[in-house]
Amino acid sequence: PIERYGFDAAILFSDILTIPDAMGMELDFVEGYGPKFNNPIDDKNDLLCVIETEIETKLDYVGSAVKLIRENLHKNTPLIGFAGSPWTLACYILGGGGSKDDFIQVRKWLYTQPDLLILLLERLTENIINYLTMQIKEGADAIMLFDSWGGLLSYLNFPIYSLHYLKKIITRLNQNFPTIPKIVFVKGGGVWLESIVQTDCSGIGIDWTVDLKSAKKIAGKNCAVQGNLDPAVLLGDRSFVRKEVKKLLDSLTEEER
């Protein structure tokens, strides 16, 4: 499909939960439920066992996949590697997998055991840096951080429990790989766009709740904007999809693009 449709880039298709799986939580996918960990975290002892697990060699298969994809892609087609953000991974880890209650368990830890939550976020940050470093070394031309559940955090808590760690990851990768673009996507994060841009990322991803023109103004000339067509648009017929895409493109002037 990459060659057939001439996409601007290819992205490594992988689950963001490869990191907690490598940390010993034994990821499984249950029909009718979704992702579930066979070794969930219930207390401090469980947490300490998980954060002390070395994961690098357990994720070699992802590096091999990146290398194989890069070798088979056209040289002019960039490959985007990615990882989940520390906060988003913590949501799944402390929730035992998927959630139908907006990850109430991690939010409970946030207010009752913040020190333990921070301990987990710090460890995840280091694991993510190593994971993305491996992808870059194996051929990823850009990387993207997905904070799929950042929007669950309050206005005051997002900078503490998500943004702080996103910035740590971007800063370290900028030091080691200054020419590799780094994109940050926070679902429901429109209110924090200015702060996200200040992580010194190369681009921001925005969802359909954010005005594209406003986002571009916040991003400025040195930060790209990715998004923001509502995926549900694809449920419409072909003419409707074309109309919505054109509307999106026409919302920016040539200079703004």
Question: What is the predicted function of each stretch?
Answer:
Residues K58-R257:
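Active-site loop segments of alpha/beta catalytic cores
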Residues L27-D43, S99-R107:
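A charged helix-plus-loop insertion that forms the helical arch/lid used to bind
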Residues D21-M25, P40, A90-G95:
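Short, conserved acidic/polar surface loops in the N-terminal third of protein domains
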Residues G32-N72:
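A gly/proline- and charged-residue-enriched helix-loop-helix capping module
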Residues I16-I19, G34, K44, P86-T88:
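A short acidic, glycine/proline-enriched capping/turn motif at secondary-structure boundaries
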Residues P1-E31, K168, R242, L249-D250, ...:
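N-terminal basic, low-complexity leaders that serve as flexible interaction/assembly modules and, when applicable
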Residues A9, F37-N39, P78:
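Short, flexible active-site-proximal loops enriched in glycine and acidic residues
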